[in-house]
Amino acid sequence: MPAMPGLVSVKTPSDTPPLRVAVPDTQPLSNPPRTPMKKTPSSTPSRSKPSPNRSTGKKDSPTVSSSTAAVIDVDDPSLDNPDLGPFLLKLARDAIASGEGPNKALDYAIRATKSFERCCAAVAPPIPGGSDGGPVLDLAMSLHVLAAIYCSLGRFDEAVPPLERAIQVPDPTRGPDHSLAAFSGHMQLGDTLSMLGQIDRSIACYEEGLKIQIQTLGDTDPRVGETCRYLAEAYVQAMQFNKAEELCKKTLEIHRAHSEPASLEEAADRRLMAIICEAKGDYENALEHLVLASMAMIASGQESEVASIDVSIGNIYMSLCRFDEAVFSYQKALTVFKASKGETHPTVASVFVRLAELYHRTGKLRESKSYCENALRIYNKPVPGTTVEEIAGGLTEISAIYESVDEPEEALKLLQKSMKLLEDKPGQQSAIAGLEARMGVMYYTVGRYEDARNAFESAVTKLRAAGEKSAFFGVVLNQMGLACVQLFKIDEAGELFEEARGILEQERGPCDQDTLGVYSNLAATYDAMGRIEDAIEILEQVLKLREEKLGTANPDFEDEKKRLAELLKEAGRSRNYKAKSLQNLIDPNARPPKKESSAKKWPSLGFKF
């Protein structure tokens, strides 16, 4: 992988349904909820504050927080009435259904939750447990409703504490109603954490929900299959494809046992399996799953779905360099989309982007640019119903094509437009961080190192806030370190390389090319800082890895060997150590600076060699 790699994403269907936050009924559901094929963030919610306590008789005020309302409710004696909680919960649902707004619903839900807590406290034994369910399950449902309203307001951080409380309330050992409440709470908490970009915590919640569901229903129930697929999709988003594949296989087995041959459920499973196989580079198996899914959709008369699968088949053919077959698949899908959705629909634009990429790869740059322009015309004047995620995704893919044809300024404009579309959308911080990282790469390649560092820094800040510890985060840290090197911020670069090393060693291992690249950069930085022994230690480690595990055929081996020999020689006469240009340490082929400029620049930055 190059020193400054771009970002890689898994191709998913462009017409997947958005995730909607629904307020649960007051009665527990008899079955776990069925989930969509793919989760996407919901539309932008209102960010207004909740209304104050209704018992005061005051008008709504956007300045009163939910915590204030909760404090007011604590001493209200009417909350001890066991009939008040269900009544307030009904008012909350009615407020949303009637269009009064989520602020009134939030006020009712907070008071309902307080009432249920009072009633539960009066029941022995205390929570968790309690009689046969009653107030305990009502409290759990009220907390679910409260969290859902917070989510509808876009206040996802405030939705987490009620859900964390909700999963502690029911006792799954007390029967299916408690199990369902616990399952629903874990799944809702997982969705909320996902919207906050906390993917690892989200997956942990889904896993716990699946465990509870299996204990209650058995491991072959069709509803367990739906949850397995939901969790597999989350693993795909986290780029943990082996775990995703294992769960998807289990889902496929369950659906094949309970459904007719070539069912729609099986087709959905195979489409997900194709995404996983494609991401792992197993294109032949991906193609097989897509063909079987297409046959099932054809048998069910799902013309638009067949066209979506044709696009995925085209993607596989392009990966296999079977370009004529890819063009045929794309054109077939394009004909269906134009006829069924209209010539200005975003799905049409998405096929234009695929064709643009294909013609770029085959060297037909004029045709590629023409398809890019056709797609941009659609994205610039979107039809009603087009989501900003669809537009941002399309612009991002087009920017990659412009970047590859050496038009970085146009590519940057498209990425900036994508960021602007997503910046106010909940749950998009990780996606924005990815865009900023790509912008940093482009700024770096055109020599705008200060802009590159700022872009990487913004991306790193967002990824840290989301608790990111993936290999991608390590790569971004390495890229930011390289930008700091170009700005002569040596200490900062060293810290970034050290952090990147720790993450990549954990996620990829010491023999991965990205990890080896960080080792090399860190050794060069230590050399520039005068930490010769540290630089020698790292280079000796790299050479040992190459000699014992990776082989010495790599062209970097000889360069690293020469660098180590020089460092060992210099370590023997450290008093006469000659300061080097950091640019030469990172890039041995770089031209040395003039003596007079070097003599002025290094002392002013305080470097000690």
UniProtKB/Swiss-Prot annotation:
SMART domains the record matches: TPR
InterPro entries: TPR-like_helical_dom_sf, TPR_rpt
Classification via Gene3D superfamilies: Tetratricopeptide repeat domain
Any one annotated GO CC term: microtubule
Self-association state and partner proteins as the record states: Interacts with IQD1.
Classification via PROSITE patterns: TPR, TPR_REGION
Spans of repeat TPR: 140-173, 183-216, 225-258, 267-301, 307-340, 349-382, 392-425, 433-466, 474-507, 516-549
SUPFAM superfamilies according to UniProt: TPR-like
Family under the similarity heading: Belongs to the kinesin light chain family.
Chain intervals with Low complexity compositional bias: 38-55
Annotated spans, Disordered: 1-77, 582-609
Subcellular location: Cytoplasm, Cytoskeleton; Cytoplasm
Keywords linked to the UniProt accession: Cytoplasm, Cytoskeleton, Repeat, TPR repeat
Encoding gene (name): KLCR1
Name used for this protein in its record: Protein KINESIN LIGHT CHAIN-RELATED 1
